[in-house]
């Protein structure tokens, strides 16, 4: 997903406690996809209720969000709206990958290859409309604000940080910087150990802070040039130039100044180039939103999670109590939220 410019960015390790009392605009689609990919059984099957309905995303939202609130982080989730028509090719390609992965997952389970089954199961994850609606409802009864973006969620989150309605964007994708986000947190949804694909090697997944101005200063470019680099590499709206990775793209843009000059030099074109640039420099966003945190509704949480989705009553009650303890223990701070 997004553009592959991560190797160019200046990343700094931080702790959850560094985000205390900070408003974090979370890319909801990205986060839900992480939960659906990671919260699975050994053979790749997701968590489901007694009716076979997937609940991995609900588990992730409840327990991870509770952990964030417990350390004083103020989360607000941003949901994608209608995608730009230039994204249709990328969306079709993702659909093909999901369908292929689903078939490979089933074959791996039959063959008893649990490692392959888990890998392909992760790649088959899909955030559908039912998952989105259930997630919005759960956040509402948890007292967590969410915002419906008119188009790209990352663009809306970046807009909110630029307006100083939020302090950080949280997303795994790097598109946030192309939309102008000054500060982005990665790995907020999932930390700990992660197995590298196809290897018996585990790496630590830690919180990362990336600041746009720091990266631009180190690279010696401006935001428009970063957008041009991303377009050279490839974005959700276009295929990249052949055999051009982020480091080569950086050299090309610094040498020629902008992507138009690069394309002239190479004798190639990128269709709808100006429209692609416009999607990043002037994205479709809204100011029609309210960020307000509320108190968790214990009865509705128990009904929705335990009675309707077969969650453990004890675990849900403990999560609710954690939220209530925070509410009682930090009342002065929380009064500013509500």
Swiss-Prot record:
KW Nuclease (keyword) present:
yes
Query: Region entry Interaction with PCNA: which residue ranges?
Result: 330-338
User: Quick one: where's region N-domain?
Assistant: 1-98
Stated EC number for the protein is 3.1.-.-
Checking Gene3D superfamilies in the record gives: 5' to 3' exonuclease, C-terminal subdomain (1.10.150.20), 5'-nuclease (3.40.50.1010)
Q: Which residues bind Mg(2+) 1?
A: 27, 80, 152, 154
> Which SMART domains does the record associate with it?
HhH2, XPGI, XPGN
Q: Name one GO molecular function term.
A: DNA binding
Segments carrying the region annotation (I-domain) are: 116-257
Q: Which GO terms describe its biological process?
A: DNA repair; DNA replication, removal of RNA primer
Q: Which cofactor does it need?
A: Mg(2+)
Identify the Pfam families for this entry: XPG_I, XPG_N
Q: Which domain of life is it from?
A: Archaea
Q: Cofactor: bound how, per the entry note?
A: Binds 2 magnesium ions per subunit. They probably participate in the reaction catalyzed by the enzyme. May bind an additional third magnesium ion after substrate binding.
Keyword vocabulary terms for this entry:
DNA damage, DNA repair, DNA replication, Endonuclease, Exonuclease, Hydrolase, Magnesium, Metal-binding, Nuclease
Positions binding Mg(2+) 2 in this chain are: 173, 175, 236
Protein family per UniProt: Belongs to the XPG/RAD2 endonuclease family. FEN1 subfamily.
Query: Could you tell me what this protein does?
Result: Structure-specific nuclease with 5'-flap endonuclease and 5'-3' exonuclease activities involved in DNA replication and repair. During DNA replication, cleaves the 5'-overhanging flap structure that is generated by displacement synthesis when DNA polymerase encounters the 5'-end of a downstream Okazaki fragment. Binds the unpaired 3'-DNA end and kinks the DNA to facilitate 5' cleavage specificity. Cleaves one nucleotide into the double-stranded DNA from the junction in flap DNA, leaving a nick for ligation. Also involved in the base excision repair (BER) pathway.
**HAMAP family for this protein:** Fen (MF_00614)
User: Subunit comment for this entry?
Assistant: Interacts with PCNA. PCNA stimulates the nuclease activity without altering cleavage specificity.
What NCBIfam families has UniProt attached to this entry? fen_arch (TIGR03674)
* Protein name according to UniProt: Flap endonuclease 1
| Annotated source species | Methanosarcina barkeri (strain Fusaro / DSM 804)
